Amino acid sequence: MVYRKSENGLIAGVDEVGRGCLAGPVVACAVILTENLAIPGDSKVLSRAVRLSWYEEIISNSYNAIGMSSVKEIETMNILNATLLAMERALERLPVVPTTVLIDGRDIINNAAKYKEVKSVVSGDKIYGEIKAASIVAKVTRDRLMEGLDLTYPYYRWKFNKGYGTKEHLEALAKYGVTDHHRRKFAPVKRMLLR
């Protein structure tokens, strides 16, 4: 396979999913795409069926790796630092070291000096195929994780809300309380604990 390059070498795109959730880990993905793969959009604009189809295509035609930060890490270091840690873990798990790293958003990873070029790109998931691909793989991975947790905790309907603060999730929190998978320092969960 031939992988996309900049003048500096291999390009990795990085994106995360789950930063604003009330439950579950934050999941990041790093992707180095093959030259012939043109990703149509990021995970937020694709239907579930299209996203799953592209997930399989990306997994088969890229170097890719997942990094996660647990609820405990989110609670200990805050969501921003936990997100950056998940991104760093994803990059470190790639089977090759990219030269250029493109990160969706405004933040730069703490170990940026390891790479020749690191750029944060606001709305990068609308611009760069590598970031679009990373968003798709991260979302499908996290969605599957939350669907698995839903089997043990069906009251919270994580299969549907993926841990976000939907009305039904908040109602379940009020009725059934907080689990070990909830982020206790996030305001809606914290309010439930103070009741």
Swiss-Prot record:
Manganese or magnesium. Binds 1 divalent metal ion per monomer in the absence of substrate. May bind a second metal ion after substrate binding. One of its GO terms (biological process) is DNA replication, removal of RNA primer. Keywords: Cytoplasm, Endonuclease, Hydrolase, Manganese, Metal-binding, Nuclease. One of its GO terms (cellular component) is cytoplasm. It holds the Pfam family RNase_HII. InterPro entries: RNase_HII (IPR022898), RNase_HII/HIII (IPR001352), RNase_HII/HIII_dom (IPR024567), RNaseH-like_sf (IPR012337), RNaseH_sf (IPR036397). One of its GO terms (molecular function) is RNA-DNA hybrid ribonuclease activity. It catalyses: Endonucleolytic cleavage to 5'-phosphomonoester. Its cofactor is Mn(2+); Mg(2+). PROSITE patterns: RNASE_H_2. The keyword Cytoplasm applies. Its main location: cytoplasm. It is found in: Cytoplasm. A divalent metal cation binds at D15, E16, D104. The keyword Cytoplasm applies. Belongs to the RNase HII family. Endonuclease that specifically degrades the RNA of RNA-DNA hybrids. This is Ribonuclease HII. It comes from Neorickettsia sennetsu (strain ATCC VR-367 / Miyayama) (Ehrlichia sennetsu). The lineage of its organism: Bacteria, Pseudomonadati, Pseudomonadota, Alphaproteobacteria, Rickettsiales.
